Amino acid sequence: MNIINLTPHAINFLREDNSVLATIEPSGMIARAAQTREAVGEVNGIVVNQCSYGAVTGLPDPQPETIYLVSALTAQACRDRSDVFITDDAVRDENGRIIGCKAIARI
């Protein structure tokens, strides 16, 4: 199975002992959901926006034996695609930074 990383970051998949099973480097393409925002009010001087997400750009057409890793926001915008996945079960270091994940998931 081909795994294509459509995010700007390398993704580490970790074993149960947190050793690295595989690292999927960025492909150089980034899939993104178009975003629109409209100011709808304010709270204590802070602007409140209404955001909506539309068409996805940068997502290749489905290919045999290929899955695509994208951001959760992008995956939500293309739920009809069975080949689009997000990282799941994040692992963090002692400072709270994500160092990898143990699974992938569909939205």
Where do the PLM segments sit?
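Catalytic phosphate/metal-binding cores of nucleic-acid and nucleotide-processing enzymes, i.e., regions
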Residues: 1-107
